[in-house]
Structures are given as C-alpha cells and as structure tokens.
Amino acid sequence: MEFVKPVTQMVRYVPDRRFRMCAILCAAIAATASGARADWTHFRFDPAHRGVNPNETILSPANVANLTVKWRTNIGGGCFASASIFEGKLYTADTGSADGKLHALDIATGQELWTFPPDALRGDHAWTTPAVANGIVYFGVNRPIPVVYAVNAATGHEVWHHTGPIANIVSSPALIDGLLYVAFTDGSIRALDATNGQVIWNVTHVGGANSSPAVADGRLYIAMHNSGLLALDANTGSELWLAPMPGPQWSSPAVENGRVFVGSRDDHKVYAFDAVTGNTLWTATTSDWVQTSPAVSNGVVYIGNNSGNVYAYNAETGGLIWQSPVAPGFAFGSSPTLANGVLYIASAINASATEFDGKLYALDAATGQVLFSDFVSENDEGEARWVNASPTVDNGVVYIPNYGDGTVAAFGLNAPTPTPTPTATPTATPTATPTPTPSATPTATPTSTPRPRPTPKPGPTPRPRP
C-alpha cells in the first residue's frame, strides 16, 4: 500500500499556548500535592490508552471472586460508551435507543445527577466515552451532524460546542496539554483548544476513523479505517508516518515504552510498531477478528478477539504468554482492563447475532484463569444482554454500562461484617478483713511503774486479685 499524504491540512497556533499549558500543569501539581485520587478520565484510562489503572489497591486476585452488584441504574438508552470517573461522579453516554445524552451519576449510589443536552432528540447517537479534566466533560454526539461538547462536570451546563464535518463521530476524545483531539468517520482529525473549542489544527486523511486517537510523547496515533496506523505530530498535525494494515480497523492503539500496539480485524492479528519510526516490530496471529483495543502493562499486551478468547503476549517479542477461552463462541466488543493483577473484560454476542453472553469476567492477569463472572444485566426473561462497553475500575469498584437495556452496573465487595468486641466482666473487689484490736495487757504490782506497751497498728488492706 502506497504512502498516503493528508488531503488537506490547516494549522493554527494560539498565542497563549504556553500560558495555557503552564496553568494546566500547575493545577495538576496542586492536585497531586493535595492528595487527590487519580481518577479514570478517558477511554482506556488515559490519553495513551493503556487500559490500566495503576492506582487500584482494593480489588486483587485474592478477593475478586467476591464481587457483587452494588447498584444498577437504567439511563434509558443502550451504551457503547464506557464510563469515566471524576471526583465522585461517573460519566457515560447513551448510544441512541433513547436520545443520545451524556449522563452523570453518583458513583456511590448510582443516582442520576444530570443529563445533557436538554434539547436532545430521539435518534441522536452518542458513541464516545467522555474525557474529563479540570471540571469539564468532553464528548461527541451525532445530531445527526457530529457535535463535540464541553460540559461543566458539576452542573451539566454547556461550556462550548464545536460542530464537526458532515460525517459521524464514533471515536472517543483524547485530552492532554490543553488540547482536545477528536476524529470523524470522513477521515478528519482535529485538535481543539480545550478551554474554548477553537480549532488549533485540522487534517483530513483518506480511510476514515472509527478507532480513537491515542496521544503520548508529542505524537498522536490512530488506526485509520481502511489504510493503517497513522502517526501525527500532536502539536501541528503534520504526518509523521503511516504503517499499512489491512482494513477495516476498529481497534484503538495503546502506547507504552516506545511501542504502539493495535489489533487488526481482517487478518486476525495483533501488531506492535516502533512509536518513532512506524516500523513493524512483531505481529501475532489470533483465531478470529480483533476489534478490541489492547491493555498494556509491565511488558505484557492483553487483547480479546471475536471467538471469545483472551490473549497475553510479551510486549517486546510478541511471544504468547497465555491464551484463555473465556467465552467461546461470543465476540468481545469490550476491551480488556487491567488493575492490580486482575484483567476485566465483558462479552457480547455470538456470530449469528442470536445469543448474548452479557457477562463481566475477571481473570488472573498472570495465568488467564477466570476468577469471577456474572451478568452485567438481565431482561425480564432472565436472558443476558449485550455488553459492548469496556470495564472501568476505580477504588475497589468495577463500573460497566450495558448496551442491551441501558443500565449502568457497579460491582464491588461487600463491607466486612464488624466483629463484636466482647465487654470485659469486672472482677469483684474483695472486702478487707479488719485487724482486731488486741486486749489490754494486765499490769503486775511493780516496785516501779513500767512504760506502757504501744498499741499495734492495723494491718494493710489486701489488694484485690486481677
């Protein structure tokens, strides 16, 4: 496949760019100094899309089998979008079986706090997982022309919006250094000023974009639908390289340690590329389409495929570490999530689209052994529903939206039953026995008067026994 140049490119620079980046950096430092918890603010956790929460300490392979449903909330429309977490709130979007809204829920109770936009219409489609930073939630919705919104995270009020091209938006945004990166199905990729929505740069590339952009080390990576993995300069939009891959592409890339990892549908492979040059480092072949996005941590790449298998590969060599038939015959639309030694993934639908697995699975990341599984949701007949969102793990709870019936579920551990503290029975204090007063000593008839004997003092009172 020949090297393809962008069709159009427009680069704009904002004079206060350095000031904006400094302000954001100072805010991040202040949050860290105050002990703020690192939230799950993106599709796949962070702008690099590694799919790993390094801060999780509560759930582990030792206790994840004890997960139970803490709450379920029906938001009225099926969700392809995953959940983002920010300062005690969960944000997700319904895909359009209702009206394509952004929803904010209380993470402790599942109570819905607000929805946006207020003028949402039935048939609007919101496919994107929100990105959250500095009190602003960013997401895209097709109305039917795509619109990118910035919404106040506390109130649900609009901050700004940006109207996209005549296309669709199914990619989730990435936010870093004050720039919001969004991609559209016509192949246009844009960098917007996160504070006001102003276009910083805009490029259009053949092939279209159904995957989400990952950003790391000043470069943006995105799997173009029919051309391959594209790398752009994150500051200017200039093309750096294009690595051909057979299309179409749905997997979103993940970046770690100078490598970019992505799945490929038609040839059933996982690819590893050099992040700087675009050279192919290795490929590994699975048993079926790979439409999920990889999770990468500590030199291991995890990914699922359309046969219900989950794979773990050596990130440096591509060697297979383990393969686990988690949900045979069911396609994984959900991407794996890693946290504290546990790999989470949800299953969806069989090849003939007649059966739904609809379960959340938790695997031992070291061995692939299934430690836990349960239905994310069930309908009135007890049949499982279709799950396409990826799990979000935060502070001991796994959150996952459901496409089939529009519920968001939270799985966590039950609080341990407190052990009663026995009340100590006091020991009775024994009564002291008084010392008797001695009788007077008779006096003999002396020739001289003798000195009287002193009266004996009372004995000491005995101490009670412990």
Residue map of PLM features:
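Extracytoplasmic/lumenal domain signature
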Residues: E56-G78, S84-A126, A131-V170, A174-P422
